[in-house]
A protein has these predicted regions:
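H-loop/switch region of ABC-family ATPase nucleotide-binding domains
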Residues: 152-153
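H-loop (His-switch) and adjacent beta-strand-loop-beta switch element
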Residues: 165-178
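Conserved ABC ATPase signature
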Residues: 91-95, 99
């Protein structure tokens, strides 16, 4: 079991097939489960799945965001580090990987959720853009006291931008502060002797 405090970031890490995405599906009531999920107060969830194929859709950034909300589009783009004047009329198909991920994050937060779920939020972006996106999410959390849960394979980056980690590997599950979970001895218990900590 684990508990996530309001206004903190939980990174969920582990190998493919460990159950990370299934955990998100459970939190979204999209999969059956046993046990109990308790939310403190009213919860409104914003969600960006691991693969959301929107780049082939022939619509602009403005049109895409308008499917969810027509208010505060410019402010929402600014909050994820994008220039609204430059981006609004651009087609989704011409955006870089980093720009598209930021637009998807804007889509997730445009209706003011208090919990954000990101399944691999930096898929398909280069290392510099990856770190910039995590930094942006950290700043967003600080400004709005939003609670963020994110799935990532890159524990070396998310350790710097998360308050807590849930490390999953088959039957082994460990939850705690990120620095504690990153302890090399614990990582070897979770992932085996082949793990390399840098």
């Amino acid at each position: 079991s684990f508990e996530v405090k309001r206004g903190t970031t939980l990174a969920i890490v582990g190998p493919n097939g460990a159950g990370k995405t299934m955990l998100f599906r459970t939190l979204l009531n999209l999969a059956p489960y046993s046990g109990k999920i308790e939310w403190a107060g009213r919860v409104k969830i914003g969600y960006v799945p691991q693969r959301l194929s929107v780049s082939d859709i022939p619509i602009s950034v403005k049109e895409f965001l308008s499917f969810k909300s027509t208010s505060n589009i410019g402010d929402c783009l600014s909050s994820v580090g994008l220039d609204s004047d430059e981006m609004l009329n651009k087609s989704l198909g011409v955006l870089s990987g980093g720009q598209l991920q930021r637009v998807l994050i804007a889509w997730a937060i445009i209706d003011n959720p208090n919990v954000l779920l990101f399944d691999e939020p930096t898929t398909g972006v280069d290392l510099d853009s990856e770190e910039a996106i995590y930094k942006m999410l950290s700043e967003l959390k600080e400004k709005s006291e939003i609670t963020i849960l994110l799935i990532s394979h890159d524990i070396h980056i998310v350790r710097d931008y998360s308050d807590y980690m849930l490390s999953i590997n088959k039957c082994k599950t460990f939850f705690g502060e990120s620095k504690a979970i990153m302890d090399p001895d614990l990582q070897r218990i979770i992932y085996g002797e082949a793990v390399c900590m840098a």
